[in-house]
């Protein structure tokens, strides 16, 4: 990751050389560092999201490839027995001997029927899911999420600037298997508030005092009239009064100049009128 940050930083510096006419201003080192960290975090986030997508696809393919095992149906072998045919009784002759009857052939029908009854008495209502092998849930997705959250916490160094904080994305896996990532919103710094207070003076003028208040508590240029010392406040008012007096003097001088110019113009017009009257006489 350090190599990627150095590579991105070197690429940004080489793409905008100082000798270029389009180069306006060199960025602050802290800003460059924050941008490099943000680029690294975004690359990590995209990398882990790609890992999660690939792992979920592999898990789905593994589950889809496992088909339920069909239960084995017992095979019953029943040996057909020959139907005994009635044989006529032998005719006993005086000179013949009685034939000895052959022993009756034994069959195994009773054993086959007992096997059939045993199979039928078994519980055949067992669900097909019980015949499937026990599936052990894969912990690869949870491992990737844990590693991503750990890297989010360890790779973010404490910034020396308290004015800006980079957002950190946190991913969690829900009970239904879905993955949700949340990124907190960072409020940008507000522009400073400039207020001007004008107070009329007994001489007819106006004294205006301008104060700048920054909503950021860590800014060094924050100025609040409530926290300002009385000596500083009086010096600011005195300075504004001197400036106002100088502007008033300039205005009065301009008015006097305008009045003198107007008087001379009127005198010239009167002289022209008198000369025109003399010419008519």
UniProtKB/Swiss-Prot annotation:
Induction: Expressed in the late phase of the viral replicative cycle. Residues 154-175 have a biased composition (Low complexity). Residues 1-33, 93-112, 149-188 are annotated as: Disordered. Pfam families: Orthopox_A5L. Keywords: Host membrane, Late protein, Membrane, Virion. It comes from the Viruses. It is found in: Virion; Host endoplasmic reticulum-Golgi intermediate compartment membrane. Component of the virion core. Participates in virion assembly. This is 39kDa core protein OPG130. It comes from Vaccinia virus (strain Western Reserve). The lineage of its organism: Viruses, Varidnaviria, Bamfordvirae, Nucleocytoviricota, Pokkesviricetes.
């Amino acid at each position: 990751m350090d190599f990627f940050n150095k590579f991105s930083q070197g690429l940004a510096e080489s793409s905008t050389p100082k000798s270029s006419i389009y180069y306006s201003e060199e960025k602050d080192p802290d800003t460059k560092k924050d941008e490099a960290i943000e680029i690294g975090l975004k690359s990590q986030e995209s990398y882990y999201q790609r890992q999660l997508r690939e792992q979920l696809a592999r898990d789905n393919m593994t589950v889809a490839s496992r088909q339920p095992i069909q239960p084995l149906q017992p095979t019953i072998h029943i040996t057909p027995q020959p139907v005994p045919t009635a044989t006529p009784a032998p005719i006993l002759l005086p000179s013949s001997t009685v034939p000895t009857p052959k022993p009756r052939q034994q069959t195994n029908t009773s054993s086959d029927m007992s096997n059939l009854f045993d199979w039928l008495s078994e519980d055949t209502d067992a669900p097909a899911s019980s015949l499937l092998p026990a599936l052990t849930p894969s912990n690869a997705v949870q491992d990737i999420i844990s590693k991503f959250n750990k890297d989010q916490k360890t790779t973010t160094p404490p910034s020396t600037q308290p004015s800006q904080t980079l957002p950190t994305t946190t991913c969690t896996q829900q009970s239904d298997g879905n993955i949700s990532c949340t990124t907190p919103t960072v409020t940008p710094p507000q522009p400073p508030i400039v207020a001007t207070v004008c107070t009329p003076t007994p001489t007819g003028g106006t004294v205006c005092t301008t104060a700048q208040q920054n909503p950021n508590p860590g800014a060094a240029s924050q100025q609040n009239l409530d926290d300002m010392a009385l000596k500083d406040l009086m010096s600011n008012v005195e300075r504004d009064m001197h400036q106002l007096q100088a502007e008033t003097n300039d205005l009065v001088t301009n008015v006097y100049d305008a009045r003198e110019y107007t008087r001379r113009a009127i005198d010239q017009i009167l002289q022209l009128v008198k000369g025109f009257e003399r010419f008519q006489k």
